[in-house]
Every structure is written in C-alpha cells, then in structure tokens.
C-alpha cells in the first residue's frame, strides 16, 4: 500500500513524512498532474474529505486504486478573541473580506500572519487563547476515514522564531514559553495538532495495509 498526499504544500509533505515513517509516501505532483480542488466545505473535516476524495478519484482514473490510498490534511488556527478566525480560512486569511468571502488569491504565510497581528492590535490585545485543529482524511477503495488532532495555547501580536511555517511564529502552546517558531522540530512533532491527528490516522492506515495484497 502506497500513500499519495493530497497537498502541494512542501512543508506539510515534509512533516507528514517525518511522522508516518515506514510507509511509501508520495507528494501529489509525483503521482498525478496538478489540478485545482475547490475547498468549499464549512468545517475542517468537510474540506479534508473533499481533498482526499478528489485525489482518490484521480487515482481511480489512472487505475491505481488497488495500489494507493490518498491522505489529506485540513488544518488551521482559531483565535478566541477573533470569534474563531481565521479557522478554515487560515491559509486564505489575507483574502478573506469583512463579509466572510474569499476574494482573490494573494494570501501567503507572511500576509496572513500580518492580518492576524493587526486584528489583535485593533482590539488592543497582545494575546488571546487560541487552538489549532487538524483533520486527517483518508480515502481508499474500502471507504473514507477521518481523524482529528488539537493543540491549545495562545496567539500573540508579534512574530517570534523562524522555524516553521503558517502561524507558527505567533502561537505559544500550553506549557511552553516559546512559540512554535522557536521550538525545535522534535518537540513540535510531539505536541502538534497534525501529529495527534496522524497518530490516530495511523491506526486506520495499519488496518488498511493488511487488506492490500
């Protein structure tokens, strides 16, 4: 059984490969031609399933459903003081207008972080309770499966550290005085929302692996 990841995010690919050792794992571009997936779900779970199902459909078109499963991750940060923003729009936060609609495709890690900082500062806050959510979805010839992982802490109004991506430099996990951007990879791998979700998803993968010839 081989796994193709339903993402073009190289940072996510690296992190997932580090956790799921012992599997033959491929980035999306290594198996199928890149194609656009419209993530129009209202939850992390819905969007994760949209991605894993879309990729598995491509695998079926190529006659690879007996060889591969698809695995996707949909994750994001929710800040209490911002009413749960950016949430499922974490990767597209800069492009999110005041009416909750995504306009344009200009969002990147840097301007997403800058927007979150400006939102906190507008409320005269230096920090707010926040949490990360990760939903891992697996699609296979046997069906679809999901698992969730969470990490709690606080979002702050200044960037600290350069080790990581996304909002890592703005998030201090509970029990630590450093941001994810300041922590080493080994520590992050132990506590991250994605790792917790992958730990549960690994039970599914082990079970599926037994059913592949």
Swiss-Prot record:
Binding site residues for substrate: 7-12, 75, 165-168, 188, 193-194
Gene Ontology CC, one term: cytosol
GO biological process, any: nucleotide metabolic process
Cofactor: binding details: Binds 1 Mg(2+) ion per subunit.
EC number(s) per entry: 3.6.1.66
Alphabetical UniProt keywords: Hydrolase, Magnesium, Metal-binding, Nucleotide metabolism, Nucleotide-binding
Record InterPro entries: dITP/XTP_pyrophosphatase (IPR020922), ITPase-like_fam (IPR029001), RdgB/HAM1 (IPR002637)
Active site: residue positions: 74
Catalytic reaction annotation: XTP + H2O = XMP + diphosphate + H(+); dITP + H2O = dIMP + diphosphate + H(+); ITP + H2O = IMP + diphosphate + H(+)
EC primary class: hydrolase
Binding residues for Mg(2+): 74
Gene Ontology MF term list: dITP diphosphatase activity; ITP diphosphatase activity; metal ion binding; nucleotide binding; ribonucleoside triphosphate phosphatase activity; XTP diphosphatase activity
Cofactor(s) it depends on: Mg(2+)
PANTHER family per the UniProt record, alphabetical: INOSINE TRIPHOSPHATE PYROPHOSPHATASE, INOSINE TRIPHOSPHATE PYROPHOSPHATASE/HAM1 PROTEIN
Function: Pyrophosphatase that catalyzes the hydrolysis of nucleoside triphosphates to their monophosphate derivatives, with a high preference for the non-canonical purine nucleotides XTP (xanthosine triphosphate), dITP (deoxyinosine triphosphate) and ITP. Seems to function as a house-cleaning enzyme that removes non-canonical purine nucleotides from the nucleotide pool, thus preventing their incorporation into DNA/RNA and avoiding chromosomal lesions.
Family the entry assigns: Belongs to the HAM1 NTPase family.
Assembly and interaction partners: Homodimer.
Protein name, per record: dITP/XTP pyrophosphatase
Organism: Campylobacter concisus (strain 13826)
């Amino acid at each position: 059984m081989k796994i193709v990841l339903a993402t073009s995010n190289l940072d996510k690919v690296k992190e997932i490969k580090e956790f799921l050792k012992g599997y033959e794992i491929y980035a999306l571009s290594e198996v199928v031609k890149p194609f656009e997936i419209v993530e129009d779900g209202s939850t992390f779970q819905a969007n994760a399933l949209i991605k894993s199902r879309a990729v598995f459909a491509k695998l079926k078109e190529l006659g690879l459903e007996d060889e591969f499963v698809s695995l996707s991750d949909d994750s994001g940060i929710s800040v209490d003081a911002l009413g749960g923003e950016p949430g499922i729009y974490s990767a597209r936060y800069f492009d999110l207008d005041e009416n909750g609609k995504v306009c344009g495709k200009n969002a990147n890690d840097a301007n997403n972080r800058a927007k979150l900082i400006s939102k906190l500062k507008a409320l005269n806050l230096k920090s707010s309770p926040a949490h990360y959510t990760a939903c891992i979805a697996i699609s296979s010839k046997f069906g679809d499966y999901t698992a969730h992982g969470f990490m709690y802490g606080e979002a702050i109004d200044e960037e600290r550290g350069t080790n990581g991506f996304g909002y890592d430099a703005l998030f201090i996990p509970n029990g630590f005085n450093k941001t994810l951007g300041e922590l080493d990879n080994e520590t992050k791998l132990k506590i991250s929302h994605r790792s917790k979700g992958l730990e549960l998803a690994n039970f599914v993968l082990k079970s599926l692996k037994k059913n592949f010839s």
